[in-house]
């Protein structure tokens, strides 16, 4: 029974992996992204289905599905006919068949020509000629058809060689993964399976394994790299791209320690330099994107006042946790939640090293934005709030403050330490799902103390994070107060 249960857990974990989705294509093309930019979308999370012409491959969960090759060319032809006509499957007359083999005879259920219905098939009525034309295979003269990444059935030697190579790589990945998972105890397998099936909603504890000399495709594959690529990021190449979250064993352990945590949801990918999307500045003169100044216009003053009201008048909001007479240890930051220009709820003081800020989380504690009520909310705010999901993990670490995007939609960050030194343009960084970014650098902040302040009110210890919507020169929203849902992180000066 013990061996049987462990084997079942290993098989469930293998079926829960994600693979690049090459069947749906890029899916995006033109159009405006949900963040308001004209650029390509960020790398989607395993459950995200947003399309977008992204350079990275979309990932999807592996679903138990009957492969096309399993029914043979005859079954594939019947399935293709059924998708085009929407009728019942009919037997295909073999070449050289007798007069009794009429193409109008319907196959009996369970017979040789019968193909059972599948929930994964798309049935289109033949009466709708437009849909039939859209679903029909394209002419060979179509350049997009020639660029199809999926080889046709029964292709030439090159396509068969590519398929055989993919099968060999898949088999090698399965062998290496099984060899690693079978080293884990039943409790560790349960923890790992819960984290994978909840998509990080229940990250669970550390899953420690000895540092093994695993190799995949002739390259070293540490446990955290192997499972991170298997369950979260199929395009992950090196372990240095991963950052352990605070509280994980690998966060405090030595880099060459005897054990390492392989829970993929105890790691995040580092957010490197990005190429910004095509700016909206080509539609407007660039002089509009100067730093805010009180003398610019009434709109500039309004936006500046809205985003700095908590700084200029901190005593306006009464919070017992922020009182200097409080006996609690000093908080290292306070979090304010805004919807456009309206602050919702009270300041949330953070005392722990890390805090979760979320809309809906299966397990855990922190700042729940879903419990903050407002009498009148616009439709854009409601839509954006529904995209917050697991939200972010904000942590204070020795080198600075980090934000980890736990949700399924990107977040957008602006911080004094992210701006270019001496630059006048507003820098807003896009953080895809599953990525982390250092939103505040303690070392760089010391240099900002002696730098000349920008025009207008300026707070060197304030970080702004917007959910799902970007702002600034590269987006249609020029100010943070135009974003439906955003956070203001007010860092305590006494660190």
From Swiss-Prot:
Q: Where is this region: Disordered?
A: 1-115, 133-161
* Binding locations of Zn(2+): 206, 248, 261, 266
Q: Which InterPro entries does the record cross-reference, listed alphabetically?
A: Dwarfin, MAD_homology1_Dwarfin-type, MAD_homology_MH1, SMAD-like_dom_sf, SMAD_dom_Dwarfin-type, SMAD_FHA_dom_sf, SMAD_MH1_sf
Q: Which SUPFAM superfamilies match?
A: SMAD MH1 domain, SMAD/FHA domain
GO annotations of cellular component type: ciliary basal body; cytosol; Golgi apparatus; nuclear body; nucleus; protein-containing complex; transcription regulator complex
Q: Which family does it belong to?
A: Belongs to the dwarfin/SMAD family.
Assembly and oligomerization: Interacts with NEDD4L. Interacts with WWP1. Interacts with STAMBP and PRKX. Interacts with RNF111 and AXIN1. Interacts with TGF-beta type I receptor superfamily members, including ACVR1B, BMPR1B and TGFBR1. In response to BMP2 treatment, interacts with SMAD1; this interaction may inhibit SMAD1-binding to SMAD4. Interacts with HOXC8 and HOXC9. Interacts with PELI1; this interaction interferes with PELI1 complex formation with TRAF6, IRAK1, IRAK4 and MYD88 in response to IL1B and hence negatively regulates IL1R-TLR signaling. Interacts with TSC22D1/TSC-22.
Please state what the protein is called: Mothers against decapentaplegic homolog 6
Organism listed in the record: Mus musculus
Q: What is the lineage of its organism?
A: Eukaryota, Metazoa, Chordata, Craniata, Vertebrata
- Whichever gene encodes this chain, its name is Smad6
